Amino acid sequence: MQLPDESIKEFQALYEKEYGQKLTWEEAREAAQNLIDLMEVLMEGDIKEKKRQNRLKTEPKGFPMEGGPYSCCVCRQSVPDEQTWYDKNGIKCLHCQRAVDKRLIPAYVCKNHDTWYSMWEFDFYFKIKSATILKFVRQGKLKMRIVPNASGGIHERLFLIKDNHGVLPHKPRSRWVPTEGNRTTLEYEKVPFPLLET
């Protein structure tokens, strides 16, 4: 979609007012176009989500997805559409869906990622390798929930903060920090990990 000149001028004025910096015509045109493209993607996603929500009214237990691949809201793996399930808790792979159905993991983990850790997050947030975490599990210091795969092996490991009260800290909060050259980087707060302090 070609932006009218009036819209580009308006964007330049808004940007200068908000950030105190003038944009060239080309910078303003590109930034405004990027904003419109983003809005189109968001609207398209919202329309798809509303259609899914309406379909749930006739299929309240959920349904398989079409038009994938999709990312599972629990394990975050990319899954082909025939191996996904959508219900009131969101899009899940069939392994995670079965784990929710069998109450191996609570349904709230689908939408509230701040209430649990996956194995990779220990390394990401605390620089603790999975071997150390599994040692804590064997020693009974950490409780782990397992999402099994179809053959009974391990598909995903979850560590609920609720199951490990007083042992697992809340998830570190993030913030954008300015760096050189008008750029920003994402930083996480430092949160102590109690099992390493004993």
Q: What are these regions, as identified by a protein language model?
A:
Residues L168-T198:
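C-terminal, charged low-complexity interaction regions
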Residues Q77-D81, V100:
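Cys/His-rich microdomains that often coordinate metals
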Residues I47-K48, Q97-D114:
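Short metal-binding segments enriched for Cys and/or His
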Residues E82-I91:
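Short linker/helix segments within small regulatory modules
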Residues E66-G67, D87-K88, D114:
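Flanking scaffold residues of small Cys/His-coordinated metal-binding clusters
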Residues C110-F136:
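Polyanion-binding surface elements
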Residues L94-K102, K143-V177:
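Short helix-start
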Residues C72-C75, C93-C96:
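Short cysteine-rich clusters marking metal-coordination/redox-active sites
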